[in-house]
Amino acid sequence: ATKWKTRIIWEYYKSTYLKYKKLNNKSNGYLIKLTLVATLGGLLFGYDTGVISGTVGSLESFFVDPKGLAEYESSRLTGFIVSSALIGCIIGGAIGGLIGKMFGRKNSLIIAGVLFFISALGSSMPEMFITTIGQGDHTLSNVFIFYRIIGGIGVGIASMMSPVYIAEIAPANKRGKLVSYNQLAIVGGFMVVYFVNYFIALSGDDSWLNEFGWRYMFASELIPVTIFLILLYTVPDTPRSLVYHDNEEKALEVLKKVNDEKEAVEILNDIKDTLKEKTAPLFTYGFGIVVIGVLLSVFQQFVGINVVLYYAPEIFKTLDLATDTALLQTILVGIVNFLFTIIAIKTVDIYGRKPLMIIGAI
């Protein structure tokens, strides 16, 4: 009798374990899919921001030089053309939260994707809707700037909504690590576009690059953007967003796919409770932390990282390097950025957030 009892207990625990393992593998696969789709928004953030680096000289040759401006005015216009997307980033960052609340996290990412698409198409062909494709000239510099600002708005929205989507879809015990992959995707986007710019530059000489090559660099973004938009239609909105928009049934369905049934119900109830609470006291309690977080982002810009990300090829050209060689050197910048982001992700749970931020500040 004891032998049979032992066997029954063993079989019970064995079947329970196998059931849990099967459920866990299934939920992990689904969670990885959702995370990968969301991080494509981060990749496009890096791609759209970094693509300009390979086109600075060409944009100056195409849009600025024919205007016959004085050196100071010429440099100022070139700088504005290159950095114009940042205007859109400010707008996108300011309205991203409101859009996410009104339309949901998924739809916000779709909006960002559409803006990326419009920007990539318009930046590569600013004469579109104005004259024959390929017949544009320096008079369209303002149109080009407009399309870059559109892309910047997409960057601002994606920079906010991609990590929010991941954070709201992931279980608490995996949230921190999965959200960090969005940063990896951003620097990955920079690295990928540096490679793309380099190989496009190899397709012709500087004359071809200044006339047509820069167009292909901007147009290349259409490929990842299209993939992003298609994949977004295969994923759901986040449970929190679904509850906010009175779709609790769908929210529970999503939660069950990444958690066991009992935990899914508990999380759903927690979401409903938190949405009923006022956020003002919570913000007041953590105001200092929020300020520090914002200042970290501000100081990151103050160290001049964007100068390197935007102008690396031009900096290397001052060393009398050819355009393709300068773009090849820029790839190394992207690789170093990517590798150290991986190191940060792998060590953050060992050393903690604060020590790594101190090391980065030093």
Predicted regions and their residues:
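Short phosphate-engaging motifs
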Residues: 250-251, 263
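Alpha-helical transmembrane bundle of multi-pass membrane proteins
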Residues: 11-249, 256, 273-362
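Short intracellular "coupling" helices and adjacent cytoplasmic loop segments at the cytosolic face
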Residues: 257-266
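TPR/TPR-like alpha-solenoid helical repeat scaffolds
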Residues: 265-275
